[in-house]
Swiss-Prot record:
GO biological process: phosphocreatine biosynthetic process
GO molecular function: ATP binding; creatine kinase activity; protein kinase activity
Recorded GO CC terms: extracellular space
Protein family (similarity comment): Belongs to the ATP:guanido phosphotransferase family.
The gene coding this protein: mcsB
Name under which the protein is recorded: Protein-arginine kinase
Species this chain originates from: Listeria monocytogenes serotype 4a (strain HCC23)
Origin: domain of life: Bacteria
Record-listed E.C. numbers: 2.7.14.1
A Pfam family that the UniProt record links to this protein: ATP-gua_Ptrans
Domain Phosphagen kinase C-terminal: 21-242
Primary role: Catalyzes the specific phosphorylation of arginine residues in proteins.
Signal peptide: none
Amino acid sequence: MNVFEPRLSSWLENAGDDDDVVLSSRIRLARNLKDEQFPIYEQKEEIVDKIAGAFDDNFTLIKMNQISHLEKALLVEKHLISPYMMNKSEYGAVLLNEEENVSIMLNEEDHLRIQCMTPGLRLFDALEAALQIDGYVEEKLSYAFDKQFGYLTSCVTNIGTGMRASVMVHLPGLVTTKRIKSVIEAIRSLGFVVRGIYGEGSLPASSIFQVSNQVTLGKTETEIVEDLTQVMEQIIMQERIARTTLKQKFHIALEDRVFRSYGLLTNCRIISMREASDAISDVRLGVELGFFEHISRQKMNELVLFSQPAFLRREAGRDMDELEEKVIRAKVIREILGDK
């Protein structure tokens, strides 16, 4: 297993429910060990070894102080560790399985953050996998738990279940028809949070949003997932209606926008991250509307991931200035689309 190779994790490679709109689902459980200082106050390297010792050979342990900054950035771009872990976790580590759909961060804000990812809208599958791992760990190690408040976490917004359920969605229809603001306001009024592609602290870009629960106390894991699933089903329906409206009422303008973006990606020699992201979003919409039968969703995911800065530095084998990065990005995009 070489997690730093340019390949898609299984949750980006495989098909999932409603994956014309939903890119992925994720369940994250925050846990801390009983009678140990939380990592935000004191990080102990022996905590990593203690937790890692509870897992078998199906998981690979990667310690943050044993890899380069570039390798950390690659893990962030693959959504296997958080930006917080990359920048602030001196004695942090991550346990990964072969498929890269399970990521267990150690010594992040909490002692453990168990993440399970699935393609499309499959929150219940992710929940089942996360709870199975959680139960396995709890058989071997004692968690910090309070009868009144549930699982104790570094951030008070996570106490209770300690669970964050999140869904990554592509909503170009709602963005283009200018209905996205009212949809986001409705989502927030129901107690959910809308963020960017890298979660907390990141801004939505290129019509990609992350929707997650805000409440972790007073509801069970199943209830939280049921509520988020219902919200997502409404968002999916609204996005599909918006796409249909665009195709029926503004067909020529939509085709022009999509094919201009395709032309840019297949012919560019210099392209910025923002320009590439916007064009990839347009082409992904075109793929979903049947304009490009030769381009798969998997190919679109490759474009998103491998045009990121860390993967480009890996491709070049060195650090680059801004212009060099734009040139390499254009080259990688053309190669993925078969137009070298």
